[in-house]
Amino acid sequence: MASSSTAYYLKDAGFHIRNIPKAWNDWNLFHVFQNFGKVSYCRVVGQSNDGQVQLGFVNMMSVADADEVRKNLNDGNLIGENFTLKVTDHKNVGGSLLPMASNSVQKLVSSPPSKSGPVLLSSSWLPLNKDIEVEVVDYLPSSSVAPDLFALTLLRINDSSMKEKYDSMHEKMNAYAQIVPFDSELEIGYDGVFRDAPRSVRRVRRISATKLYLVDFGKIINYEKAKCFQLPKVFQSMPTRVSLCGLDGLTWSPVAIPSFDNIREVVKKWGQMENSTLHAMACGFQGSINMINLFCGKSILADRLQRKGVCEYLPRSQQPHYAYSRETLLQHNNSGVTAQISNDADVVKDLLKKIDGVKNMLRELEL
């Protein structure tokens, strides 16, 4: 959508909607009208006199797009699934509504975005025990990563359904960004939106005073306050497209830990050196981290690292497993009740990890 100053006054392309449901916002209205063509501008501007419905304005990108809307009007009503909108065509009223509309819209567009608490998008979970094609991208730092855990940031590739979902989100964000003011301070460690081109915006996390991370593309860019604004709630529900991952079954030599950054750079180029696509398989979870096996053809990264002598590798099939009864888990997880399961601190710690793992797997199944 273009800004109201250039698009809203397009002759014969505007509509006034008089009975927008109270639960609707700009995007509900946008979704209705985009079915007929390109929407230049749309806004829910306030309640009607009786307070039961809202008023709104829509301007299409061209007269041809507006004519498509007109073809679908039935006696001034736009009828859809579970709604009927009363639409006044500006073409038929000689523009008498435009001064009122422009004042309301201009006031809203020039108003600063509402202040809310800092936003932090959730990391993307990988499907359990499923072979997926991935790319190792720029590392996204996380406070949940232990100093001795080698972590990577992965981006799923060749996944048409996921690409379609995120492409749709970015299309909506690009339309929204044409009508909101930028220049908003992002706190370090939190997420917002960055304009990387005149008609293109991206979700970002501020990772330092000077750097931003594109959380759906896996790239680090420079921070520019004048190109940032707060992340609207409608775009907060989707997790980052990148996934925080750790290599499963590795115990690192203390002398290798300071070299993690260098090792990550080598792993990023691993697929190119092997002339093949990297594949990952999540075999478990450690808190918010996907624990994975990473391989390229018949070459397994953990094996290669072990042969370099920088770590020890124990495949998951050989790792110790602990089993607990359903009753014990329920008793331990019951609010306000501590189960007497063991005096061994390591066993208790392991049980807590298992509970976290179960919760994460349930979350994955819901997706």
UniProtKB/Swiss-Prot annotation:
Main localization, broad class: cytoplasm
GO MF annotations, alphabetized: RNA binding
Gene Ontology cellular-component annotations: cytoplasm; nucleus; perinuclear region of cytoplasm; RNA cap binding complex
Keyword Transmembrane: no
Phenotype reported upon loss of the gene: Worms whose mothers are lacking mel-47 exhibit prolonged interphase between the two and four cell stages of development. Mutants arrest as early embryos ranging from 50 to 80 cells with no signs of morphogenesis. Chromatin bridges which connect nuclei remain present after cytokinesis appears complete. RNAi-mediated knockdown results in maternal effect lethal (Mel phenotype). RNAi-mediated knockdown results in chromosome segregation and cell division defects in early embryos. RNAi-mediated knockdown results in defective activity of the PIWI-interacting RNA (piRNA) silencing pathway.
Keyword list, A-Z: Cell cycle, Cell division, Chromosome partition, Cytoplasm, Developmental protein, Nucleus, RNA-binding, RNA-mediated gene silencing
SMART domains: RRM
UniProt region (Required for ife-3 interaction), positions on chain: 298-345
InterPro entries from the UniProt entry: Nucleotide-bd_a/b_plait_sf, RBD_domain_sf, RRM_dom
Residues covered by the RRM domain: 13-92
Tissue specificity of this protein: Expression is restricted to the germline (at protein level).
UniProt subunit comment: Component of the pid-1 variant of the PETISCO complex (also called the pid-3, erh-2, tofu-6, and ife-3 small RNA complex) containing at least pid-1, tofu-6, ife-3, pid-3, and erh-2, which is required for the biogenesis of 21 nucleotide PIWI-interacting RNAs (piRNAs) that possess a uracil residue at the 5'-end (also called 21U-RNAs). Within the pid-1 variant of the PETISCO complex interacts with pid-1.
Function summary: Component of the pid-1 and tost-1 variants of the PETISCO complexes, which have roles in the biogenesis of a class of 21 nucleotide PIWI-interacting RNAs (piRNAs) that possess a uracil residue at the 5'-end (also called 21U-RNAs) and embryogenesis, respectively. Promotes the biogenesis of 21U-RNAs. Mediates the interaction between the PETISCO complex and the PUCH complex, the endoribonuclease complex processing the 5'-end of precursor piRNAs, thereby enhancing mature piRNA production. Required for chromosome segregation and cell division in early embryos. May have a role in DNA replication.
Protein name: Embryonic developmental protein tofu-6
Species, as recorded: Caenorhabditis elegans
Lineage: Eukaryota, Metazoa, Ecdysozoa, Nematoda, Chromadorea
